[in-house]
Amino acid sequence: MEIIKRGLLFFLIVSLSACSSFMDAKPEGNTLKELKSFYVIDVDRGLKESTLPDGKVLYVAPVRVTSQFRHKSLVYKVGDNAFQPQPGHQFFDSPEEIFTTQLQRWLVKTGIFSNVITDNKHSADLVLETAVTSLYGVKIEGQRPQSVIEMQFFITDRHLVEDAVIFQTGLSIDIDIVETTPPNVVKGWQTGFKKLLATLEDDLSGYFHDNTPQ
């Protein structure tokens, strides 16, 4: 179901790890000699909004991806706490690079911030740290095929004591797909990621509107 869920947050000070097991990879296809397929997640917000007159500079830190999903191979969930990589089906870039680029590109168009950057952290007012904690396709007998994505977001203000966290949220979404195949799973992730970014934008817009001096 395409329902965005909000979950508990865990600070990124703790390194992202996983207790889930990985099964031996059985790549889809008839032979390991088959050419690999490469995928990207690409979302577009559309037109850029007018920038808020007192918007701040936001630094987007490199997105962190929890250990079992940070490699280029797509991953299926095939059982309780069991995941299986698909070596013949990979992201074109690392998930960290893909999500960082897409997140920055979306946020710069929201107009909430005067600028959204991915370098020169020290010139920014705010720092956004993001974690991808789930990124898999569901392929379990008796369960509906789905693309699952879960993300956590934290914004700190560099002008406050100890870079205090001023905004945090956790969002997840399960997108139903016809069949668990690599193209379907990636398309589901793309749909889900766009919905998560739209929800994040609404939350950020509300927060900064309510906390902007009138």
Describe each PLM feature range.
Residues 82-89, 159-201:
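Short secondary-structure boundary motifs at beta->alpha junctions and helix caps
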